[in-house]
């Protein structure tokens, strides 16, 4: 049985008592600001009962934008301001370029051989180059345009057929849409076990979030088993591995044109040609990255964008008017139609500010001792960049908690991590390599949902009754499904 974090922490304390007497935490004169901590568990008690990104942000407001967090055995630095984010992601970018080892990475990501979790070194550099030049290049992202358009149109038809006045579960529809787009991009076609594959990925993403007892007490292997996490991850990995093996074994031979290549085609071509030292497990790890990380982040962003627009009728009217005037009754949307729609892009940027997919950017690890702001940072120290706090820093953002797309009008701030008060995809060497693909998978689906339909809450609910509660997994999702009632907009060939 899988244990809760609270129960796991209690278990951890009990196990540690068997090994040594309780002692106070050691401190030095040259230590970062921190909250009071307990023996063994460190600061974990401050985070029990709250979402990790909100708990860490509350602590940062009290103890500073550069603070120490002791997570069990793991010493951690938390950066919660643009100033310190710039410092660690530029001056100390290489120093903090490693990834900490995790139980999930070991089991699910084929011994940390994917792009996201692989340690800094030659193998990671080759994967990063592969992403830049092949898998996630602008040309490759563009090559998937037709399948994005086709699947978005399928969503429109599905919603139109749902029945007048009936609520639509947009959470489920959007996740399924993005999963289908990415499976076709990854494998060249929809897969026959699509539903099972998607459910397995969902379960992995659910297990990935938060501070897990197995990762905060890495040396106490018994906790990995007692918590149930190792068994659960092993079981889910075996199912996933079997599915991917079936997909690869049924995959057709090489394409005649590189423009027709799926992501799997590219990886198999490079593996067979020995251009990269890729094993079959490496290929599967990278494919899982493309599918898993991309599905969760894009679907969450679309959901949050629609949620914020529902609560802000002024912005909803503005973005729908822009879309409908530009398209002028056109029945089928193509990506070229939305490239110049400035307010749609502002809506997405503001959504990513308030709801970054990874509010605590994927942790890094210190590769060598360094001195940061006069504080000595040992090797293996974990680094968390608190993007949630940075994106809502009132020193940089007026009315920081308010959804206001206009704030980005005539602003040089972009998503690429060059402005450190806005880091939806991180920055530096370990910045998310899939930002361009992710944006493409947000813009077109969102445009379809807003162009073809007007939306309202079911049962006459007031706008302020829309539940905006969060659920922390690999990304921060809505806690409850987004249920909305659509009314079809009349296009040139649709009178419905």
Curated annotation (Swiss-Prot):
Organism: Barnadesia spinosa (Spiny barnadesia)
Source taxon at top rank: Eukaryota
Glycosylated residues in this chain: 493
Transmembrane portions of the chain: 3-23
Cofactor(s) needed for function: heme
Gene Ontology terms, MF aspect: germacrene A hydroxylase activity; heme binding; iron ion binding
Signal peptide feature range: none
Name of the protein in its database record: Germacrene A hydroxylase
EC number: 1.14.14.95
GO CC terms in record: endoplasmic reticulum membrane
UniProt GO BP: sesquiterpene biosynthetic process; terpenoid biosynthetic process
Topology, Lumenal side: 24-496
Membrane topology type: Single-pass type II membrane protein
Family under the similarity heading: Belongs to the cytochrome P450 family.
Described purpose of this protein according to its UniProt entry: Involved in the biosynthesis of germacrene-derived sesquiterpene lactones. Catalyzes three consecutive oxidations of germacrene A to produce germacrene A acid. Could also catalyze the three-step oxidation of non-natural substrate amorphadiene to artemisinic acid.
Positions bound to heme: 432
Enzyme class: oxidoreductase
Any single Pfam family the record assigns to this protein: p450
Keyword vocabulary terms for this entry: Endoplasmic reticulum, Glycoprotein, Heme, Iron, Membrane, Metal-binding, Monooxygenase, Oxidoreductase, Signal-anchor, Transmembrane, Transmembrane helix
Topology Cytoplasmic: residue spans: 1-2
């Amino acid at each position: 049985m899988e244990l809760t974090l609270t129960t796991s922490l209690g278990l951890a304390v009990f196990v540690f008592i068997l090994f040594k007497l309780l002692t106070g935490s050691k401190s030095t004169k040259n230590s970062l600001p921190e909250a009071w901590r307990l023996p063994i568990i460190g600061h974990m008690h401050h985070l029990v009962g709250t979402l990790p990104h909100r708990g860490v942000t509350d602590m940062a407001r009290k103890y500073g934008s550069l603070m120490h967090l002791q997570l069990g055995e793991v010493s951690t630095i938390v950066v919660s301001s643009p100033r310190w984010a710039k410092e660690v992601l530029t001056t100390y970018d290489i120093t903090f370029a490693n990834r900490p080892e995790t139980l999930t990475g070991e089991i699910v990501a084929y011994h940390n051989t994917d792009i996201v979790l692989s340690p800094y070194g030659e193998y990671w550099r080759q994967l990063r180059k592969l992403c830049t030049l092949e898998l996630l290049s602008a040309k490759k992202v563009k090559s998937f345009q037709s399948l994005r358009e086709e699947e978005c149109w399928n969503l429109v038809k599905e919603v139109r057929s749902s029945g007048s006045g009936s609520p639509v579960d947009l959470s489920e529809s959007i996740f399924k849409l993005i999963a289908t787009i990415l499976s076709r991009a990854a494998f060249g076609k929809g897969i026959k076990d699509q539903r099972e594959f998607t459910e397995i990925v969902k379960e992995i993403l659910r297990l990935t979030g938060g501070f897990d007892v197995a990762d905060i007490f890495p040396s106490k292997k018994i906790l990995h088993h007692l918590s149930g996490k190792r068994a659960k991850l092993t079981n889910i990995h075996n199912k996933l591995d079997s599915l991917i093996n079936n997909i690869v074994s049924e995959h057709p031979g090489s394409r005649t044109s590189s423009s027709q290549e799926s992501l799997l085609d590219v990886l198999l071509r490079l593996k067979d040609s020995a251009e990269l030292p890729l094993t079959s497990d490496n290929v599967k790890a990278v494919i899982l990255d493309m599918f898993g990380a991309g599905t969760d982040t894009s679907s969450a962003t679309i959901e949050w964008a629609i949620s914020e627009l529902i609560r802000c009728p002024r912005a909803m009217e503005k973005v729908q008017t822009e879309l409908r005037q530009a398209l002028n009754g056109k029945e089928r949307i193509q990506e070229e139609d939305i490239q110049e729609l400035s307010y749609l892009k502002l809506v997405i940027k503001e959504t990513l500010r308030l709801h970054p997919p990874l509010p605590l950017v994927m942790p890094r690890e210190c590769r060598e001792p360094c001195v940061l702001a006069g504080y000595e940072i040992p090797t293996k120290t974990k680094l968390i960049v608190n993007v949630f706090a940075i994106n809502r820093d009132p020193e940089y953002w007026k009315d920081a908690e308010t959804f206001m797309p206009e704030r980005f009008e005539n602003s040089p701030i972009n998503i690429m991590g060059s402005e450190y008060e806005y880091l939806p995809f991180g920055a530096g060497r370990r910045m998310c390599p899939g930002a361009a693909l992710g944006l493409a998978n947000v813009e077109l689906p969102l445009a379809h949902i807003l162009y073809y339909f007007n939306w309202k809450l079911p049962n006459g609910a007031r706008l302020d009754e829309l539940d905006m509660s969060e659920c922390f997994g690999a990304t921060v999702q809505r806690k409850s499904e987004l249920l909305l009632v659509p009314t079809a907009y009349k296009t040139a060939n649709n009178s419905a």
